[in-house]
C-alpha cells in the first residue's frame, strides 16, 4: 500500500525541468506573446508566426486592480495548465508553470491578465429599458441599449422574481438552462452546474442533448461500436511508439487542441508525441489545412489535402480499392462485424449503379486516384492507427465520417491490435496519456437533494432539445423535429439563463441567433467578461475568475494524474463574486439556500470532494495525504501502473468478442445498422454513405462563393476564451481575426499579408486580416473559431461584423435527423479586398452605461 509520503515522492519523481523561461509580469505579456514555438521536452512543436502579422499593439490597458492579500505565491490551475501565481502588492505579477508540466502553455500570461481585462464585467448590470419595465420591455433593444449599474441585491431580486414568475405562469419547461460552455476549471466553481442546481430547486428547466464538439460522432458511434467513442481513453502513446507502423491523423491536430483540458493539464501528450517521433513512426496528415502536428513530425509526415467535407467519399473509395484488390481482412470482418455485405454492395455500385472507385472520389475530393489507392494499401499493409479529429464531423451528414473511419479500420483488420485501429480522442484532453491509480474527483452536482414548493427537479414537464437547435427552438415553439429515433416538440422558451458560456461564439449563423435571442422575455448571463452574449442580456452578473476564488480540480480528464488546490491569489476585482456565492445568494432569495448549500461553505465542499476521494483511494490501497497537507502543498500526484501504460483500446474485444462484446445490438461493430434503417431517415442511411452537402466546393452556389471555409481551433484561445487578452491580440492583423488564404488565391484577389478582406457568405459578412500561407488548399480559407462578435451596428441583424467572428458566416441547419449536430464546416464564402475605413473593435471594451435616471 502506498502511503501519503510515497505520494509526495511520486510528485518529486514526476518533476522534470521546466521547458520555458521564467514568465514575465502580466502587463508585459508582449514578450510572452511573441514566442513563436512551443518547447517540448526533447523537441519543438512549431507554431510559426506567419508573415503579415503585426507587432502587438498595447492599445488596450490591463490595469491592475486592488487586493487586500499580501505578497504571496499560491498554486492555481486552469484549462491551460497548473501554475504558481506570484502576487506582489496584492497584484498578480506573473504565472510560472509547475516544473512537472511537459509542455507549458504559451497562454499563461494571458491568464494572468484575465482579472484585469479591459472587457471585465465589473458590476451587476441591467439593460436600461428592462430595469424600467421588466420583461415587458421586450427584446428589441438587446445588444444596442446601454446598461445601468445596480446593486447585487437588486440584480438577484430581479433574477429570483423572474425565475418564479416564468415558472408559475408557463412552467419550468419555459426556462432554458442548457448553458453550454467551457466555463473555468474547478469542481466547485462549475458555473453551469451551480446555475442548474438553482434551476432544479426551482422546479426544473429545459436542457440540451450533446455538444458542439462532437454533435454527430457521439450520436452515431453508439450504433456502430456501442459507446460514444469520442470521450474514451485511447491506446497509450507508449504502445503507439512501440507497435504502430503508420499513424494517420485525419482532421486532427493534437499539438493545438491538447494545449487545453476540460479539467487541467500537464500536457502529457507532448511526451507521447515525442516517443512516436523518436520511434520514427511514419505519419500522414489528412486535412485541407496543414496542421501544426505535421510541422512537429517534420519530414516524417506526409500531408494530403482533400476538399473540405469530402472525407467520406475518399474513405469509401479506399474501401473500394481494398475490396477489389482482395486486400480486405475478411477474417476480421467475419468475426467482429455485421452488415458488411450491404455496405460493400453500395461501394461497388450494385445499389445505385455508381462504383465508388478512387477515380470517382478524385472528382469529389480533389485527391489523385493513385494517392487514394496508395493510402488504402499502406493502411492495410502496415499496422495503422486512424487518429480521427472532430472538425470533420461538424458538417452536414457529419455522422457518416466517424462511422466510415471505423469501417475502414475494420477492413484493414488492425482494430484491437496494440498500436492499431482507430482513436477519436487523441487530440482532446491528452487522450492516450496513461491513467493513474487514483479515484475520480467529485464535484458539485446540478441535482440537489430536494425541491422547492413541492416541485421536484425531476418531472415530466422537463424537456431536452439538441444543443445546436436551440435557435430553431426559440423561434419555433411547438415545432416537432426528428432526433435520434424519436420525436421532440420544442417548448416555448420565455427565459434564458446562461452561465460560463458564450453562445454568440458557439452557435452557427449569428444573425439568426440575434433574431432568436430577442424572442424570450428575459435573458440572464453570468460571466467574467463582456462577451457578445453578455451584451445581448437583460441582466448581467459579474463572476470571479479562477484566480480570485478557491477551488479544486484534477489533472487530466483521462489520465487523472493528480489533484490541484486552486488557491485564491487575489481578492475579487470590482464587485465580482465566485459562482458559488452568486448562486448561494440567489437560492437564499428564492427560499432554498439550505438545500443548495447542504450546510457547507466553499471550503467545506472542496474538503468533501477531496476526502471522499481519499476514502475511495484507501479502499483501493492508496493512501492520500490529509486535506490540510494537500492544501498546504498545493497539489498531489498519483502513480501510474504498468498496465495503464500498456492500455490497448478494444483489445479485450479482439481477444474474445463473445466474453467482451461491444454495446451494440449485435455485440459487434455494426457496418450496417438495422436500428438506423428502422428510422427511415432520408439524410442518414443505414450504412456509411457519401451525400453532397448543401454548401461545398462541388455545389452550384460555389460559383458565387468559391471558397470553402474552415473554422479551425485557434492556438491562442479556447473557443472564445482569452480573445481580449494580449496574447490573442498579437495574433490579429489590423486588430481583426486573421483569414488564412493560399498564395495562388491571394494573387488572383490582389491580396497580401497584412491587408484586410471582407469575407461573405449567404448569412453575413465579416472583416478579417489577411495571412497568405501555403498551409491551406487554394480553394479553401480558414478563420479560426472564437473571435468575438463586434458588429458595425449594435444589436442589428445583418450588419457587418468588423472583427472576424466565424459564425456570422456559418450555416445553421441540422447535420441530419439522427444527431441534429452543428455543421459549421459546411460553409462557402467569397472574399474581396477591403479598402474602406476600419471601424474600431468595440467587443473588447466596456459597453455603454448610463445612470438609472438618465
Where are these regions (language model features)?
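N-terminal leader/propeptide and maturation segments of large enzyme subunits in energy/redox metabolism
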Residues: 130-154, 327-367, 569-666, 670, ...
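Catalytic or ion-translocation cores adjacent to nucleophile or general acid/base/metal-coordination motifs
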Residues: 531, 544-568, 779
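Long, contiguous, secondary-structure-rich segments that constitute the structural scaffold
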Residues: 573, 578-633, 720, 726-740, ...
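Acidic/polar loop patches that form or flank catalytic/metal-binding clefts of enzymes
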Residues: 207, 328-331, 372-373, 385-386, ...
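Short beta-alpha connecting loops at secondary-structure transitions
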Residues: 299-305, 561-572
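Active-site phosphate/pyrophosphate-binding segments
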Residues: 318, 339-469
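Extended redox/cofactor-interaction regions of prokaryotic respiratory oxidoreductases
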Residues: 190-275, 279-286, 293, 313-316, ...
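N-terminal export/assembly segments and adjacent metallocofactor-ligating motifs
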Residues: 2-327, 368, 586, 747, ...
